[in-house]
Amino acid sequence: MCGIVGYIGYREAWPIVLKGLKRLEYRGYDSAGIALLNESGQNIYKKAGKVAVLEEFAESADRSGTIGMGHTRWATHGVPSDRNSHPHTSNNSKLSIIHNGIIENYATLKEELLGRGHEFKSDTDTEVLIHLIEEIQKIEQIDLLEAVRLALQEVNGAYAIVIMDNDHPDRLIAARKGSPMVIGVGKGEYFIASDATPIIEYTKNVIYLKDGEIALVTKDDLLVKQLDNVVQTPLIQELELKLEMLEKGGFDHFMLKEIYEQPRSIKDCMRGRIYPNEGKVQLGGIKEFAEKLKNIDRIIIVACGTSWHAGLVGEYLIEEYARIPVEVEYASEFRYRNPIITEKDVVIAISQSGETADTMAAIEMAKERGATIFGICNVAGASIPRLSHAGVYTHAGPEIGVASTKAFTAQVTVLTLMAFYMAQQKGTITTSKMIELLTELEEIPEKIQQALGSNDIIKEVAEKIKDSTNCLFLGRGSGFPVALEGALKLKEISYIHAEGYPAAEMKHGPIALIDEEMPVVFIATQNSSYEKVISNIQEVKARKGKVIAIVTEGDTEVKKMADYCIEIPDANEAFLPLLATIPLQLLSYHIAVMRGCNVDQPRNLAKSVTVE
């Protein structure tokens, strides 16, 4: 959600922090701000709107200083405005703070501080935190690091914070709980950020702060403590991220680039994990649990958004091939009820970023109740892999567009591999069948490349329906989660109201909406429910609905009925979700572009939802 950048060293901080905020724009935000320290004191610049607005606002201002921090805000407490933008200052204006997260007990703390004479300039929970830190430092007569440590013990909620002190212009203080934070290690300089994207062009050596850790950062040194005051020895890791991965590479938008990267990202996801000639899948991340997989009672998949749709595909695959019962849960709902969980359950947590707050809370609860946790994640070093007993990385590479594309197909690929691996362990699949499936799975990247070849046709279809106000997506079997994902993509980036349904459920309500103005997108590939989908198409046509069908290459039956057909290569039913998703991504993209929408940064959306 919010983006954080900090710098301390020998270079000018402004260009580093500003570029870092631009790198973090993909996370979603509504305002931006930067604070700098130099010989004359602290300078804070903040504006509602894009980073470019902030840059223009501060163009003629004093932007000197080798210590600075910046923030992109996604409003939670207080409307988007200049005064609610970060950084915020203490009552005496000597301390400043940037913050990602939510302080849940801020209202109670604010009342106490108001009673002690504090005056607030914003409506945010963040300003309350920096006032609390100042108050504790004043009353206890302690240094700032200790005041921060004590203050954080009084707050409930999640946070990643960076604090600057006018009286000590040679240091930054950073801390985190429930929100991500990474520290880049340079020579005579340190970088702080929400993720590694602002850091990669300066250093590949990073430290991922753990929950409940506080860091005192100077240009030459780093001290890390836990909230209980125990000093830690941080682990320095090397980033695999490359700078060119963060550029558009000639595409108009990151989303389009990432759609076209899917043949490669899926190949990367499978590399070293499938052996078609032997009919074997190897998943090193979960191999130590191979024996346990033979005796588990149930799998529970927890996720949010697009990852939840991937989980639904996983449910079909795991039950079909491994014959293990699967439940797919919204993490945000699962964590707030009292689910029955035993030590014979495996919980699979899916998150692109590995920092999704509700998913983290769900697996922490399941872990406490004895379940084994497997994580599926795209970001090495993120929180969910660290919280999990084992897991599998998707290796999709950085995904900058807010609307997920290649991360979704990589998650589905990993779930496919997990389904086959579990089937292999349980003996529910023959070697000959596995050879057949893996041989075809190896061909999927090339088939996705073929599906991308329909881009011009998809663009023509987009032109025909771009002015619609509603759209329905229908599918059966594993085509249902594809329909859900197609609807989500369209509403996310084009702002057209869209819903996904099982095709058979159409007559239980949605059919009332169908008329000549309603586009209905069918996942109508030649699978086990093909004939039933044809009947559903006929029902829509009888009510004059406009039918757009995703069909298997060479299909003639659906073409007789549909207004528009988009072909994908033929494939085993297990792999159709990977192929059928591609034209829906392109359709949503082109409609959004034609409507003049901000494709990479849709309104009100955040790439990584790190608050509940």
What are these regions, as identified by a protein language model?
Residues M1-D252, R264-D297, Y336, T431, ...:
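Conserved short alpha-helical segments that host acidic/polar catalytic motifs at enzyme active sites
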Residues E291-E436, E440-E443, T525-Y564, I568, ...:
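Glycine-rich phosphate-binding loops that contact phosphosugars or nucleotide phosphates
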Residues Q262-I266, M270-I300, A390-P519, A592-E612:
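Active-site phosphate/pyrophosphate-binding segments
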Residues G49, T66, G70-R83, N277-A290, ...:
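Glycine-rich oxoanion-binding loops at beta->alpha junctions
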Residues I4, L36, I97, I163, ...:
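Structural beta-sheet core signal
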Residues N229, K546, K559-M561, A571-E612:
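Generic C-terminus detector
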